[in-house]
Amino acid sequence: METTFSMTRVQHIMRRDLIENWKSNLYGLLGIFAACFFPMLGFLWSAERWTEEGYPEVYSFERFCGNMLGIIGMVVSVAMIYYASHIMKCMDNKEKRISYLLLPATKLEKFFSRVLFVTIGTVLMILVALLALELTHYLLLPVFDLPAVYSQPMLVEVFSLRWAHASVDATGEPVYSWWLMQLLVWIFCLWNHSLFILGGSFWYKHPFLKTIGACLVVTILGGILFANLAEGGFLTRFSDWMQEHYQDTPQTVNGLLTIISVVFLLFTVFNWWLSYRLFTRSEVVKRKLWRL
């Protein structure tokens, strides 16, 4: 077999995954839709009550969209990390591992196909669920006695609320670069996603729960360390050193945002690299340590 990367072989692997997992993918799509639909139903009922109580129409619609933004954000976040943790679902038992490891493709092609499946595939699933949610929103309007403003596209308003403006100081000047802050948020999300990719590459059975458990343990240990540093006065000394050597200006804040973004980006790349290394060392019979 050729060792050069071939998208044709990747397509064959992905087609095989789609055929074998179409039922679980359909259930996942319905689950994402249901997780957004039932809260939306409750919010529409509440919006009808807001109208009866005399709330302004625009305020009522913005409040409804703000509530939906929180729900959609939470559902999308959970869906992305859940499917990321199942990147090695195709190898969660001995028979599947034998079948997958014997596929006529390089390990890079197999790993790349799984990456596409749990990233691009999940995004497409979410988009379909959200479009179905928007259509359902229009179909439900005649059921509720709502103002005409609710006939606007819900998702457009929801995503417009997502792009908040940067904070400003007393003079009206931005405290930091809005674009740098958005970049940091997205890189942090990618890093968080890569943690579940790494967890899914290490644990094949119940990877989502095990990765969450590992993250909780690390968070608790980090909290204890942070408390000890604060109690020892390290944070106070560090704050005094920062104030002495750096002025509290937008340039300083932007520099700090840039450094943090680069650090989290490097952590993200490392997690992806380590995930691939774990996959390349996959065996038919896993070591006992990996059976946790």
Cite the ranges covered by each PLM segment.
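Hydrophobic alpha-helical transmembrane segments of membrane proteins
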Residues: 1-98, 107-292
